[in-house]
């Protein structure tokens, strides 16, 4: 569906959790193989940082409690000037077929403008990695920092992500 929209000239920007900010490493392990197709269609990709800046901290921290790490759990699509889909529904096979989650479609320019501003702020270099492909090599850039492998919270998370990739579980994610 995204490829069709791109072929019609629609700009598509995706904000997804980075390896470091995802709460289900198994999901990330199977998402990674779709990056080349996203790049091939000209889709812009951003991965939310597990160590975000002021915007992320403001949204996550509830004084006096400060989050040790922050993950992205937002499920929203902003389409055009006034349509927003938001809810608990993951956009995957399992959620659509098995889970009993919900979503709303809201048609309001004011709401869409607010959501767009929020998501744009979450895509800033302080909050997210801009993921690009240069000569077939994926790069994560955020401000002056550029990395050649997915930013993770720990070596254990990297090993877990590798092991999950070996399991035939994609249809269950």
Residue ranges and their predicted role:
Residues 1-173:
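PLD/PLD-like phosphodiesterase catalytic module centered on the HKD motif
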């Amino acid at each position: 569906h995204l490829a069709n929209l791109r072929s019609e000239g629609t700009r598509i920007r995706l904000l997804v959790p980075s390896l470091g900010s995802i709460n289900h490493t198994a999901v990330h392990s199977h998402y990674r193989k779709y990056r080349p197709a996203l790049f091939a269609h000209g889709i812009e990709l951003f991965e939310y940082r597990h160590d975000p800046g002021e915007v992320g901290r403001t949204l996550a921290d509830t004084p006096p409690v400060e989050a040790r790490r922050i993950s992205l759990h937002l499920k929203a699509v902003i389409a055009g000037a006034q349509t927003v889909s938001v809810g608990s529904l993951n956009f995957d096979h399992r959620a659509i077929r098995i889970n009993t989650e919900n979503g709303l479609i809201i048609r309001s320019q004011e709401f869409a403008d607010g959501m767009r501003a929020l998501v744009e702020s979450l895509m800033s270099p302080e909050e997210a990695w801009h993921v690009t492909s240069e000569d077939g090599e994926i790069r994560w850039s955020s401000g002056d920092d550029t990395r050649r492998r997915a930013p993770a919270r720990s070596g254990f998370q990297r090993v877990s992500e590798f092991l999950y990739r070996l399991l035939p579980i994609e249809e269950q994610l």
